[in-house]
């Protein structure tokens, strides 16, 4: 797995305010854990730890 901003099918990050929301989202997708990264590269977005390779992550390019 990898540590990354989890993305939806449109290459958009998940906006967040609280850590539990991201931890839940990340672990449901197979990650070890997750938290809300505040004021990061994509604003407030969920960051996952050890996310499986099959799950999409935010890559360069626009969020559609």
Swiss-Prot record:
One Gene Ontology MF term: toxin activity
Keyword Signal belongs to the record: no
Listed GO CC annotations: extracellular region
Free-text tissue specificity from the UniProt record: Expressed by the venom gland.
Subcellular localization(s) per the UniProt record: Secreted
PROSITE patterns: LCN_CSAB
GO biological process assignments: defense response
SUPFAM superfamilies: Scorpion toxin-like
Signal peptide, first to last residue: none
InterPro entries (UniProt xref): LCN-type_CS_alpha_beta_dom (IPR044062), Scorpion_toxin-like (IPR003614), Scorpion_toxin-like_sf (IPR036574), Scorpion_toxinL (IPR018218), Scorpion_toxinL/defensin (IPR002061)
Keywords: Disulfide bond, Neurotoxin, Secreted, Toxin
Name this protein carries in UniProt: Makatoxin-1
Organism: Olivierus martensii (Manchurian scorpion)
């Amino acid at each position: 797995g990898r540590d990354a901003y989890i993305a939806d099918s449109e290459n958009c990050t998940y906006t967040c305010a609280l850590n539990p929301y991201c931890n839940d989202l990340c672990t449901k997708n197979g990650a070890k854990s997750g938290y809300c990264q505040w004021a990061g590269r994509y604003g407030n977005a969920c960051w996952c730890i050890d996310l499986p390779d099959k799950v999409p992550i935010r890559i360069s390019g626009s969020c559609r």
